[in-house]
């Protein structure tokens, strides 16, 4: 089981805050409340953050490094997308409450900020308004990712090179 530590260096989050879309629209006080729930973990290049079929446990934000999204079918893995600093992932499985449908692997040594399912549920109980803002932002992020996937499919249909 991966170790997670409390996020103590909040300044490191502030430097990438503009890239973290699901934290948009919250006040400083609300953001500080969210920051208290965040943890951090490191992953070496090639290490899996989460695997297809596992129960989702966290929403991840990339603080340093790059993460690849891999889709697999019968032992064939295809890189669907690469995520960079400030990007979040893991929210689809977490919100849909289904096991992971893809795997995420560190493309280079990476540091991830994480929001656990337990912390998200605690936020729902403690501050429903902040919880609702986060859920709306995550839904918006998922809609963007769905559009990205639609674009990939459309380009594939037309034989256009797809940039990951």
Residue ranges and their predicted role:
Residues 1-164:
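Cytosolic regulatory regions built on CNB/CRP/Popeye-like sensor folds
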